[in-house]
Amino acid sequence: MNSTKENPVEIIRTRNELQARVRAWKQAGETVGFVPTMGALHEGHLSLIEKAQEKVTRTVASIFVNPAQFAPGEDFDTYPRREGEDIAKLASVNCDAVYLPTVAEMYPEGSVTNVRVESLSDLLDGIYRPHFFYGVATVVARLFLHAQPDVAVFGEKDYQQLQVIRRMVRDLGFPIEIIGGATRRDADGLAQSSRNLYLSPDERRAAGAIYSAMHRAASRMALGTLPSEALKEAEGYILTAGFRKIDYVTLVDPATLQALPADTPLEDGAAARLLAAAWIGKTRLIDNISVTR
């Protein structure tokens, strides 16, 4: 809803500043959309800002590399941090403000309260990264309290995360509408991700195979092929393309994320979600697509 303007994005670094800004907007009759990120922004992130702008009159993005969602040995220290570039990108899509809190601002000394979304956090990525969704739910709950938005937009590329946040909002009664934004892809189908920056040229050339394999599997299952057959073929294709390890390629219920039977075809009219996680070199890529028969 924002019109083109020349004003730069407002930089906000504390909870009090952010709440004062949002309060002033709301008192003036504005509505507020929020897009939390960890920075290293790409077109996928910017599309989430633009989706929020379809619903609200003001948009806020946050950039915070959340230590609570990284386990020892993961890439917290090496995760790309590009504050200046990110702010320029947000300004290019007329984002009104960017929230850049410190760790101390998000987790004041002595904080002991965390948010755990049972069941949804323990499947799929939760098996391989058991710390991850507890860190995500906790930081997003805190960011919601800081930003107090009317609408928040999360990418469907992180589909399990989106479902965890939706459940948390429902269970805790946050008065926030959660919207999923479509996955942005490169020309070869690879889902845009900040971690794609880790890929070597050879790895990048091979990485699109994860989407190609999923797309073929989804098409076959939509025509009645057994999931077990389609998923096995997808795994083989991914490994042959140069991925070194697969964590999972699985078909799940879109809402509960519970695995669907692999030995029976999808029923006519049934909807499912195909999710995958695999390693190429030292980089773990995830992706998902919808499947409908």
UniProtKB/Swiss-Prot annotation:
Example of a GO MF term: ATP binding
Pathways involved: Cofactor biosynthesis; (R)-pantothenate biosynthesis; (R)-pantothenate from (R)-pantoate and beta-alanine: step 1/1
A GO cellular-component term linked to this record: cytosol
Taxonomy of the source species: Bacteria, Pseudomonadati, Pseudomonadota, Alphaproteobacteria, Hyphomonadales
Organism: Hyphomonas neptunium (strain ATCC 15444)
Family as reported in the entry's similarity comment: Belongs to the pantothenate synthetase family.
Cross-referenced Pfam families: Pantoate_ligase
Residues bound to beta-alanine: 69
Binding annotation for (R)-pantoate: 69, 161
Binding, ATP: 38-45, 155-158, 192-195
Protein name: Pantothenate synthetase
InterPro entries assigned to the protein according to its UniProt record, in alphabetical order: Cyt_trans-like, Pantoate_ligase, Pantoate_ligase_C, Rossmann-like_a/b/a_fold
